Structures are given as C-alpha cells and as structure tokens.
Amino acid sequence: MKKLMVLGGARYALPVIKAAHELGIYVITCDYLPDNIAHKYSDQYCDISIIDKEKVLDAAQKLNIDGIMSFACDPGVVTAAYVAEQMGLPNVGPYESVCILQNKGKYREFLTENGFTVPTARSYQNVSEALKDIEVFHWPVISAAMCLALARRCRALLCWETIPWACR
C-alpha cells in the first residue's frame, strides 16, 4: 500500500485525506498538535513539528513513505520539498527553489537579480536593523511579515517612528 505523509493537521487537509483514502493510499499526518482534526481521519499520526525538517525526514524514512505534501499549510512546504528531495520523491520543485519562493526577501532578491521590476524592499531580523535604513524609503511604506503564512500582518507605516510597532 502506498503511503502519503501530509504535513499539518488542520481541517484544510481533510479533502486530501479523503481523496487519498479513495485511492487506497495510507495517510500519515504530521504536526505537533495532537488534537488537530485531520489526525482523526488519517491512518497514523506523527507528533513532530513540521518545520523540523530533519525529524520529519527521519520519520518519513522510518515509515518508508511514497509521497509527502503540505496542503494549505505554508510552514510545511519547505520541509516537504526537503524530505522529497532527500528521499527522491516527486515534489512541486527543487528544495532550493521552494526556499526562495517561500521567503519574500529571497524571492524579491531573485526577481531583482533576474531583471524583474520589484518595489524597493528590504528584509530585517530586528527593529534596530530596520531603523538603520529609514532614509532608503519614501514614506509612507508598507510593512509585511517575511513568512508567507503571516502575510496578513501587513501594516501601513506613515513615519519611521512606527517601525517598532510594525515589528511586534
């Protein structure tokens, strides 16, 4: 029987689990929240954080999976690509490409290096880094979280004094 590992256990995984079962596929859900709804419908559950790619890889190898995916669960996409590449499984793309596409800063850098027009943007790890670049931008600006899963945390900043607020 084929085995599919689904990263994440939220309700969004339910249609995938149902479709896999209809095809006779054994489904393993994986995340660190044992009460997530999808685990009740999968055949097996792994209590592992989906962003810990090495632990997910270890579990995937031990379970001898035939496929891995992260459906409607952005944090697991990079891990799914990593595991698929390490195990020679089909995937949406190479690990390096997926890493670029899942990180806004890396994606903008890729676009710029390849001649695409992109808005002026910078990536910062903390408030003090952002404050060093206040002269680079024309105010007001838009602040957004780097992780695609947090994209709804966009904020309009009218002046540089609001940077600490935006970085919360």
Question: What is each model feature region?
Answer:
Residues 1-97, 128:
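ATP-binding N-terminal substructure of ATP-dependent carboxylate-amine bond-forming enzymes
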Residues 102-168:
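Active-site nucleotide/adenylate-binding loops and adjacent lid/helix of ATP-dependent enzymes
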